[in-house]
């Protein structure tokens, strides 16, 4: 049934695309939302039945709704309480941009449904052969990296205020921590697949995770923490115990509220690096009480990227397409500084200059970075055809790795799962960095160092 419903959704979305009005129309936006809602519910029911509640689409589909539909249907035109919408936006393009996004998600669902594996087990633990030497080495290196970060932030106090600390290095750190959790999971005995087993088997990993997360939350950096926690959610659910919906839902609600507070305070004088927790909390409460819409303010990080969808479409119509220059960096992500070097070599531009977030910030004449939108980013590079093809391929990829047949497929799924709520407000290849680091560190942690004692015994 879900297959026929998805095909029907593709057809409805295609017709709606050609009928999209040339100015804002709330009835049209509501129609798009309703058709997506019906198709999305059927699709999610199918995916959860196959995979359980902890799967990529459980988070990806609702996030896609919030980012691309909420503003057009529920917020516009009273949107000035959201700072990015105070900058110029071509609101006439809202229906067209929304129809482009809907075409994209329809083709994502189609690719996902058509290429699902025949194995319909709702739960499967991949078992990989990981030497104990690699397990211990990865845990110790992860702990050393996290402890060094903790000292840098809390003891030396070299990070003050809202900062993104060396993003590439932090991505390496969190990839190491997640890989260490995966390695440890390969050593489990039958009696270890429970909460107690998780605690006993991951003492060093838990310390590493706490040090890493505390350091970043203290300076208001949430992204890398979210990436890591989603990876761990997947691993814990797969290897230790099934996470129940009654536990997941309140955790998500509390997490959204906390992240909303952090979003409000992190760029103010009341971030945690400058004031204590209670002062920061009081400031956040005051801002929320003064807001005309508490819900959307707490969800600011999700709903504001609708603007970059509209702006991305507008930019492409005004200035033409980027023809993939924004994606050159991902061809060389495995090389240190490779992305920036080859982007400059092949395009003549710095890496920041080809990033759609940077381009759209200048296009809107904004005074701070606006970020990007996955669909808008693809549209800026390859037009509607690119949106359809790449979203279809993304759906295909998720369908093939959600039941991983090898550790490499699991690494790809971990990288995607880390980005399950971020991907919609980023570019479609942003998960590749994690995947490449998993491959590199997997190899490094397995290198066998021949000691003098071993040489003598030989």
Where are these predicted regions, by residue range?
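Hydrophobic alpha-helical segments
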Residues: 217, 358-458
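Hydrophobic, aromatic-rich transmembrane alpha-helices
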Residues: 36-44, 177-192, 389-401
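Small-residue-enriched transmembrane helix-hairpin modules in multi-pass membrane proteins
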Residues: 258-390
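Hydrophobic, membrane-inserted alpha-helices
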Residues: 10-17, 37-40, 206-214, 230-234, ...
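Short aromatic-rich membrane-water interface segments that cap or initiate transmembrane helices
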Residues: 87-100, 162-174, 370, 376-380
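Membrane-embedded catalytic interface detector for glycan/lipid assembly enzymes
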Residues: 22-27, 80-89, 108-243, 247, ...
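N-terminal "leader" segments that precede or initiate the main folded domain
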Residues: 1-118, 122, 209, 228-259, ...
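Membrane-interfacial loop-to-transmembrane alpha-helix junctions, especially the N-terminal start
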Residues: 1-7, 50-63, 134-139, 194-205, ...
